Amino acid sequence: MDVEQKQGAATSGNPLRDLSNYGQSPWLDFIQRSYTADGSLKKLVDEDGLRGVTSNPAIFEKAMGYGTDYDAQIKDLLAHEILSPGELYEKLAITDIKATAKVMHPVFVQTKGLDGYVSLEVSPYLAFDTKGTADEARRLWDAVGEENLMIKIPGTPEGVPAFQEVTSQGISVNVTLLFSLEAYKNVLEAYIKGLEIRHAAGEDISKIASVASFFVSRIDGKIDGAIDRRVKEGDKDAEALKALRGKVAIANAKVAYQHYLEVTASERWKKLAAAGANPQRLLWASTGTKDKTFSDVLYVEELIGADTVNTIPPATFDAFRDHGKLRASLTENVEDAYKVLDQQAKLGLDLDGVTKTLVTEGCASFCDAFDQLLGAVANKQATFLGSKLIEQKADLPADLKAAADAVLEDWRKTGKGRKLWAKDASVWTGGDEGKWLKWLDIVDDRLAHVSELEAFASEVKAKGFSDVLLLGMGGSSLGPEVIAETFGQIAGFPKLHVLDSTDPQQVKTFENAVDLKNTLFIVSSKSGGTLEPNILKAYFFAAAEKALGSAPGKHFVAVTDPGSHMEDVAKKDGFWKIFYGEKQIGGRFSVLSNFGLVPAAAAGLNVRAFLESALRSVKESSASTPPAQNPAMQLGAILGAAATKFGRDKVTIIASPAIYDLGAWLEQLLAESTGKKGTGLIPIDDETLGAPGVYGKDRVFAYLRLKGEACPNQEKAIAALIAAGEPVVTIDLADKLDIAQAFFHWEYATAVAGSVLEIDPFDQPDVEFSKIETKKLTTAFNETGKLPPETPFATSGVFEFFADDANAKALGHGDALAILKAHFGRVKAGDYVGVLAYIERDLKTREWIQNVRLNLRDQLKVATAAEFGPRFLHSTGQAYKGGPDSGVFLQITADDHADLAVPGERFTFGIVKAAQARGDFDVLSERGRRALRVHIKGPLEAGLAELATVIKKAV
């Protein structure tokens, strides 16, 4: 450009408009919907010669987070889509960018693509991710679809190759966050290489534009701050230092411009220019004056030159219009600029170090601003969604709140939430955790295939089944049980039953509860090798065959992982359908996969609505949701901090009666995920609330409340606990379908808590040990026809007592009262008592175990777990063996008054249950746990009544 000729052009009297006479384009560093809509932006174009617009997260945060400009669009979007805060922000931002681009398009046409651009920034979270930056740049470019768009990419070492790549693909880019000459040189080189690659491929390069955003005032902010400190301290070079105030940033910019002039004069560039290439102009950014002792237009007046852009904040824009002075300042006193840079180096002001620091701080600042922006959007979103989201409220002691907040701030600063979604194992132990995170994606995946489940539901209904009997254990059964207990029998569909026991009486009870001729059996086993579902399948397959008088395969469905033994069995036996799980989802995280959805669909649950409810929690917990707006992350932080900092590791689950069974599912999730390596969260489910005085200082209460169906007694008790200073997290569900949200909410929270506990929440190393011991015993039975003999260390009436040598020695050889008194006498503050009953789980035995546990709690002032075996082996058993050594266990076994054969096996259900109990106890003993087994001889009901009486006396 012939600057001298331009400078001779007529002046308008408006310094902003007249910048073009010097070859400089004024852009506005500001965007706001109302500003564009009311014509204010167009007025700047018409009256001030505005040539472009830049945006950044801080600008959008101010625009979107406050006022009502965006409310109508937010309401409309949320009425039609389930979005994460990041997705919602992007849709809002793209609307703004497109509207702004249309206002600026006449400038784009008039200047033949030199100006008229509006910039949209890639996520600052990707500043150090080359592939992520390039992918997002392409995605945003396509999403906006305006030719006068520039994608903003940071000039970090990782951002520069992404910039080169997308330039070669025809995308116009604003490279931002440049402070040093070296960084600028790398960016300009990348631009030229990108053009050369595209040109060599025979592609048009004339429609690509780029600017290099060179930040100015932030440099003086750092340098001048250092100067002022040294002068105040009496530095010997005080006068020389003071002479550099307000000069280093401008000198740095002038030297960068000299490099631009050299490159654009080179033969290499001229070849590209001849092919239609546009030069990458320098754009002066951060040009608002922060030091009030300087002119408020300093960084505009001193940086005027040909082929440059100055993106100006609104206040500075107005100030320059009012009193800006024009001259070709960028090429003035260039030698002095070099001298200034030499002088700062001699004086030890370390411009190189300052620019490196500014890049680091700039990336962090952009991330902070993006956090605030997404937080503001998330707050708006939560307001408009209201009760469509489950609501969480934490009443915490001040010290626990501070500890949880510290965890959340760490997650925010380090981006652990984004790392979690990226399946980065460094969030936990750096092991193979990343291989077990498909549960993060399963809701979207199942929604994409929900028509298959809906078709299955229609077929089940059409076949007229009266019952669905699911045969499974642990993660394959507990989620479906929640669905069965919460929704009951749905009109027009079969009743869902869930059997997860080897107790022969319980198996028989379930057999009697269904019409074998008219029942759909769902055999659910991820691995296909789990003992219980395999023998249950064998039993009911034979029973159904007998009832039907023919091969019953068409009454059976399998849910299993691809390639499993169960898949082979299902094919061999002619099962009606096989539904597949996802190998990279552990059982306890599988409820929103086919393991939960297939039985739900068979029972008539609206699986589409169920999954859509779950999706709300997925989006609320997304990678784009800051910790302050992420309730599931907050829950995980609270649980983790409570356990690690305050010894509050007993997570006491209270649920409204209508959703009571959520606690049973949560037990497995928490215990198996966290109870290992001597630490963990010990879930306490279904323990009726007591007065505050019966609790120790080791509890965190999780209150799952169904709005409109809250229990008055629970409400009163929870209020008393809060008043007493106990930590209570209340989670409100507006509708029963929202248990789907609760499922994901707790899965995510558990993953976060696992990180705080510094364990792998996706393995279960101690579950296998009980299986191994059980296998030894059943193998011995198959070989000899009997289990290996065992001898009680004491007998008292109908009770036989068993223990390893260490426990037996500690308990003595007295009567039942003395032994139980000694056993429970070992309980101390911070412990919990586990009552582990290998008996039929029915209304009577559940009432019995509740009465026993509450007596133990109230007398010993410790948490209590009331479990039925072998069900709990696939649930809380992991924590009892691998978690903290704070459990005192009473295992209860009993004579079976009747037994059931297992088709194809020598052992019976009763033998399997006995082997499981003994295997479980052997592992508890091997781990040095305080454990006692009492075996009841004779009638069970009478024996239980007597045991309850003795326990009451013992404590």
Model-derived segments and spans:
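Extended, charge-enriched "interface" segments that sit outside catalytic cores
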Residues: 386-462, 708, 716-717, 753-756, ...
